């Protein structure tokens, strides 16, 4: 018997050639250095388990009192986080979600009908393709280009706006490039959105991890907000707690548009009511304790970045996030697969993030320092590299 599945889920779900090569190498017992690990809970960081887990036992969570936006105490904790970033956020302008992925889903439903378009920077998350497919939204990439740093190609961005375009997505700072959106870039983005009647969606999950000259990155939550703007973040990166499943959307913009957006977002959130009570009650504690894990992560990432920069391998400029793009010597084949086979090092192919140049690969800066140093030593010593 055969069944019909939706066209929106018509992905190629077979194992990729690279994933198969990694699996087969591990099954064969090869000692691989994995430079793709991005889960902080398995990277040797010290979590205050008692402090982080004790609020989950709050008996008050046994009472069900749903609010589509999320518990007020949890939203107030998020608002205080933005106060730390010099931004004034009304708790009533926040909607809690189980993840930033869910937040994207809410916003695509809010802003788009089937077949509408959203502009997304490239390179960027591969996850966007799946999120858009599930909401019957079409993604149109606009390029970031590299010239002693990453920059937005505004001319190309505006050329790609069409009659069905509804929003521009900005990942600030961008993953994997680490490009942080500057004040002048923000002004140009807002001007383009105003000119074309578009919403601005800003993903700030890596905001607390600057690696460049600036000690702090400015949030898009800082006003003014001349256009309808949605700022997304969550505890996966802010507190290194991806397993706790907490994200949110903060809504800004002209009063009438903002009020309409919030009213509709509340209905969308009320339809799913996906947030659970224990996590919401624990959120203020997790937010208060975030500094300890952030310091550990930032120190690790900075040290690993320094190792990469001194390894002899070319590291493309990175201003933030937990990874780096390496530019290796050009070869005929797939660079990531060659490094796996010849050097026993696992890296992400640049194509995973939409990077067209075959010699570029992406490495996580989050892993244990000894493994990272050995991985870069192997890459630098691979034939063709200057190291």
Describe each region flagged by the PLM.
Residues 2, 8-99, 106, 156, ...:
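N-terminal small-domain helix-loop-helix segment of the aminotransferase-like
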């Amino acid at each position: 018997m055969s069944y019909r599945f939706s066209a929106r889920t018509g992905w190629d779900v077979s194992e990729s050639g690279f994933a198969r090569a990694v699996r087969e190498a591990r099954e064969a017992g090869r000692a691989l250095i994995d430079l793709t690990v991005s889960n902080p809970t398995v990277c040797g960081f010290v979590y205050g388990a008692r402090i982080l887990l004790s609020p989950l036992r709050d008996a008050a969570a046994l009472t069900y009192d749903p609010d589509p936006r999320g518990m007020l105490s949890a939203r107030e904790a998020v608002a205080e986080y933005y106060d730390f970033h010099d931004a004034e956020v009304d708790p009533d302008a926040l909607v809690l979600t189980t993840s930033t992925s869910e937040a994207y889903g809410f916003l695509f439903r809010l802003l788009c009908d089937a077949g509408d378009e959203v502009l997304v920077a490239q390179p960027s998350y591969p996850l966007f393709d799946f999120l858009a497919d599930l909401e019957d939204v079409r993604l149109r990439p606009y390029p970031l280009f590299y010239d002693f740093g990453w920059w937005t190609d505004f001319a190309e961005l505006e050329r790609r706006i069409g009659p069905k375009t509804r929003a521009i997505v900005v990942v600030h700072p961008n993953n994997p490039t680490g490009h942080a959106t500057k004040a002048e870039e923000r002004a140009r983005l807002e001007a383009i959105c105003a000119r074309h009647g578009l919403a601005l969606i800003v993903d700030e999950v890596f905001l607390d991890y600057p690696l460049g000259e600036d000690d702090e990155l400015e949030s898009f939550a800082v006003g003014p907000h001349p256009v309808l703007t949605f700022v997304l973040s969550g505890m996966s990166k802010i507190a290194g707690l991806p397993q706790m499943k907490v994200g949110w959307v903060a809504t800004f913009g002209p009063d009438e548009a903002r009020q309409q957006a919030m009213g509709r977002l509340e209905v969308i959130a009320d339809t799913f009511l996906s947030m659970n009570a224990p996590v919401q009650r624990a959120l203020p504690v997790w937010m208060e304790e975030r500094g300890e894990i952030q310091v550990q992560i930032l120190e690790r990432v900075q040290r690993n970045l320094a190792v990469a920069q001194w390894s002899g391998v070319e590291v493309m400029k990175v201003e933030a996030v937990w990874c780096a793009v390496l530019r290796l010597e050009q070869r005929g084949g797939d660079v990531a697969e060659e490094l796996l086979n010849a050097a026993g090092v696992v890296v992400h192919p640049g194509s995973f993030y939409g990077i067209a140049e075959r010699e570029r690969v992406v490495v996580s800066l989050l892993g244990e320092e000894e493994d990272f140093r050995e991985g870069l030593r192997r890459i630098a010593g691979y034939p063709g590299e200057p190291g």
